[in-house]
């Protein structure tokens, strides 16, 4: 099942990821919470936006279909995307979803904030602050989006809870072309079920546990889920343990480990590893490979992504004045 020519299409929810990095040399007197003096702010595309950037890294033709709000965060996001991928914009109700991590080094760089931490050379995640609640409207798709989905060589649905995966016309088009266009579905715990005929669904471990009522093993539950969804295969990503693949047609379940020689050093930033996995699988399926081959390549690709520094390669960094960062944590204020 493959479509010759055409772009690789990523359809989903594009987010703006932000890192505030600095030092935590002291704590708050009132609560012993770490006080982070921010040195710089880093922006990068997240969600479907990151997936599209990853897919385009080797020069392939990639089209991103996603919703964009009329706000400063969306403008920043478009600036990170437009030079690298073709973007087809869908109307978004509400504001851009931003996920902001506060990270630090220093003696008080610890998420619990109650004791001095053993200092690490790597930034320690102190907290994450989410903002924005934009959702894609169920308006008719622009003609450009319909044309792109019709001519795609493969589709990756990157569901991050923003409504793209639930859009009725998108789902109808994906179902109509599923027999000759491989579709990889990266699900969200609160998102819709994959469309019937999807070639591969790639939940992470936590999402799989939610779908399977807290149980994930080599038993029949995963196969029953694949049958219920009418998808060709499910691959549960397991981090450094690789992936668990289940094929609907045969009921075969296969654990695909990460080779020890490919294991990334401990402490690497895993943000975006799941997107890397899904992209690699979609590219492999577009080449006409089967799901087992696609998942084996995806396991390696995710490890290589983390080992190479993760999503940092797709970021833009700017310095931040300490007074500004401590006075107001607005992620877009410059």
What does each model-identified segment do?
Residues 1-4:
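A short acidic-Thr-Gly-centered motif at the start of a beta-strand
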Residues 64, 87-90, 200-205, 253-258:
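Short hydrophobic/aromatic-enriched beta-strand-loop microsegments
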Residues 13-14, 160, 276:
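Active-site metal-binding loops of divalent metal-dependent hydrolases
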Residues 132-136, 151, 168-182, 188-197, ...:
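Conserved phosphate-binding/catalytic region of the ribokinase-like
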Residues 24-35, 98-139, 149, 153-224, ...:
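Conserved beta-alpha-beta core of the PfkB/ribokinase-like small-molecule kinase fold
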Residues 12, 65-69, 187, 238:
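Short beta-strand/turn micro-motifs composed of small residues
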Residues 8-10, 183, 201, 234:
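Residue-level marker for buried hydrophobic side chains located in beta-strands
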Residues 6-8, 16-156, 313-334:
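Conserved N-terminal subdomain of the carbohydrate kinase-like
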């Amino acid at each position: 099942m493959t479509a010759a020519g055409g772009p690789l299409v990523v359809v989903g929810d594009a987010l703006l990821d932000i890192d505030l990095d600095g030092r935590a040399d002291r704590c708050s007197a009132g609560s012993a919470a770490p006080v982070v003096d921010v040195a710089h702010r880093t922006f990068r595309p997240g969600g479907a936006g990151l997936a599209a950037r990853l897919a385009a890294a080797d020069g392939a033709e990639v089209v991103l279909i996603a919703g964009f709000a009329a706000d400063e965060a969306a403008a920043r996001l478009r600036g990170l995307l437009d030079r690298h991928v073709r973007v087809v914009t869908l109307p978004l109700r509400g504001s851009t979803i931003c996920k902001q991590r506060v990270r630090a080094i220093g003696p008080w760089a610890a998420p619990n904030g109650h004791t001095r931490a053993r200092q690490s050379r790597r930034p320690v995640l102190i907290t994450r602050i989410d903002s924005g609640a934009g959702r894609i409207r169920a308006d008719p798709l622009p003609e450009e989006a319909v044309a792109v989905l019709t001519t795609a060589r493969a589709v990756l649905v990157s569901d991050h809870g923003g409504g793209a995966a639930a859009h009725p016309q998108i789902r109808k088009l994906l179902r109509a072309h599923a027999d000759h266009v491989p579709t990889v579905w990266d699900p969200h715990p609160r998102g819709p079920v994959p469309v019937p005929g999807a070639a591969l669904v790639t939940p992470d471990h936590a999402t799989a546990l939610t779908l399977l009522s807290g149980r994930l093993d080599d038993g029949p539950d995963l196969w029953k889920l694949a049958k219920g969804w009418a998808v060709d295969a499910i691959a549960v990503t397991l981090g450094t343990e690789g992936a668990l693949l289940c094929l609907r047609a045969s009921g075969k379940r296969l654990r695909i480990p990460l080779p020890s020689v490919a294991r990334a050093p401990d402490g690497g930033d895993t943000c975006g590893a799941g997107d890397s996995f899904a992209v690699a699988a979609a590219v492999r399926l577009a080449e006409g490979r089967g799901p087992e081959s696609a998942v084996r390549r995806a396991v390696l690709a995710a490890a290589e992504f983390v080992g190479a520094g993760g999503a940092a390669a797709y970021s833009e960094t700017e310095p931040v004045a300490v007074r500004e960062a401590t006075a107001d944590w607005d992620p877009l204020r410059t």
